[in-house]
Amino acid sequence: MVILPSPASVAAAAHWVKAWPEHITLATVGEGTAKVIRAAWGDDVKLIYPEGDAEDSGSEALWEILKHRGAPSRVLFLRGQTGREWLPEQLRSIGSDVITMCIYVRVPLELTPEQRSDILMAAHGPSPIIYITSTDAVDALFHAIRPVSEVRDWVTNGV
């Protein structure tokens, strides 16, 4: 089994893997990434994922599916240089041989002076609605807005 937890992991893997062998089953944590997998490798690839919206997805939802299917003997977990260890640990706890591999590197977002100006102007308007699905994305957002303290308050407090 190969687990691709994000669209970024799919994009990185697709750069190197043009087609998966028939005996490989792919898995991911949600429907959005499943669509990216289908776009990269077609509808015939074996794919396991929790169906539904964000409330029905995530590592925990995929774990429930995998538990009921039985432990995969070997798992290759392809991700960025950081990420939650929870799902690999759960798989190890039921006997899977899990290898976690970094296949892409996250680079911090640095706003240009123009982007800083734009976001500062936006901070004088209505508070944003931001939907973020990973702690790494939260870290990237706060890294990007750190030079503009008013924006951090605007994002965190709705002020």
Language model features with spans:
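Conserved beta-alpha
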Residues: M1-V159
